[in-house]
């Protein structure tokens, strides 16, 4: 015999459902450099952990994830979902996503509700077809006071996501000019109906750092060290100044390059990108883009460091080998270490600079330019130690 929920789920398969996961928020209330959607659960970022759990239920015909364009470029390395650029508000992100929805129903949730499990999804979906929106909620157990008056807490609900909506009803509701904080409120304001069902505490939303302690479904990030190697060369130019390792070098030459030609910083950028799995310097700072003409390589490195933190990486150490017949850099090593460490946000002892020659071999040996090999090690930010 099938029970009611099983029969309801079997009936739900007669309907098509798209899952929208909203991940375009700035995490401004999270108070860390890392965006919460990039916290790691094992080796996976939080958004992928949530999407994968939902996908494995088999309930959804399509999965859409909203985020910023920068995030989307990196997200594509993890999974083949439909990614949509988010808007300035949650509602605008939802509108953008709905342009890609052609299923009868849509389930909308926030990636920050990371402990949504199959049982909870099954419960929500089992109510498909009963109203324009299915809304999970939690009861209030504390006394509620508004404007110095005590409110009957039996009349107050803590509304959660995910919420299941009839797609046509939600699209119509969002044509209104008002801003709504959840889907069902928009649908009801537009004359639609909603059904409340009891939610679950484990669907708590990560908003503040302390919320992480409430989520038992999340395992710690992997402790693996991620390593990358970068290599770059630049020929000398008899015009301009020489910048190497983030500092100005006393030399009769500069470097022939699109930017300021700091070959050591360029190799380091590639090493960091390699460790993070984020491509290469040509992808992030293309040399055919006029905005990088004459660019200060220190600023490019600083931009990358911000991105690495944003995506949940911590720089462990870097090691840079400079191969050159000239200039002699022995007296510049400490200044390079201090400058690079200040940009990376790590202690100077974690930045190593080595110099070598090529024993007069090749273009470096002929004094035509400089080559650099850089190594970088990263780890995932460990949010369990906050």
Swiss-Prot record:
The record marks 153, 205 as: Positions MEP for the nucleophilic attack. Its cofactor is a divalent metal cation. Its EC number is 2.7.7.60, 4.6.1.12. It catalyses: 2-C-methyl-D-erythritol 4-phosphate + CTP + H(+) = 4-CDP-2-C-methyl-D-erythritol + diphosphate; 4-CDP-2-C-methyl-D-erythritol 2-phosphate = 2-C-methyl-D-erythritol 2,4-cyclic diphosphate + CMP. A divalent metal cation binds at residues 232, 234, 266. The keyword Nucleotide-binding does not apply. Pathway: Isoprenoid biosynthesis; isopentenyl diphosphate biosynthesis via DXP pathway; isopentenyl diphosphate from 1-deoxy-D-xylulose 5-phosphate: step 2/6; Isoprenoid biosynthesis; isopentenyl diphosphate biosynthesis via DXP pathway; isopentenyl diphosphate from 1-deoxy-D-xylulose 5-phosphate: step 4/6. It holds the Pfam family YgbB. Residues 226-386 are annotated as: 2-C-methyl-D-erythritol 2,4-cyclodiphosphate synthase. It comes from the Bacteria. The record marks 29, 36, 258, 357 as: Transition state stabilizer. GO terms for molecular function: 2-C-methyl-D-erythritol 2,4-cyclodiphosphate synthase activity; 2-C-methyl-D-erythritol 4-phosphate cytidylyltransferase activity; metal ion binding. 4-CDP-2-C-methyl-D-erythritol 2-phosphate binds at residues 232-234, 258-259, 280-282, 285-289, 356-359, 363, 366. Residues 1-225 are annotated as: 2-C-methyl-D-erythritol 4-phosphate cytidylyltransferase. GO terms for biological process: isopentenyl diphosphate biosynthetic process, methylerythritol 4-phosphate pathway; terpenoid biosynthetic process. In the N-terminal section; belongs to the IspD/TarI cytidylyltransferase family. IspD subfamily. In the C-terminal section; belongs to the IspF family. Bifunctional enzyme that catalyzes the formation of 4-diphosphocytidyl-2-C-methyl-D-erythritol from CTP and 2-C-methyl-D-erythritol 4-phosphate (MEP) (IspD), and catalyzes the conversion of 4-diphosphocytidyl-2-C-methyl-D-erythritol 2-phosphate (CDP-ME2P) to 2-C-methyl-D-erythritol 2,4-cyclodiphosphate (ME-CPP) with a corresponding release of cytidine 5-monophosphate (CMP) (IspF). This is Bifunctional enzyme IspD/IspF.
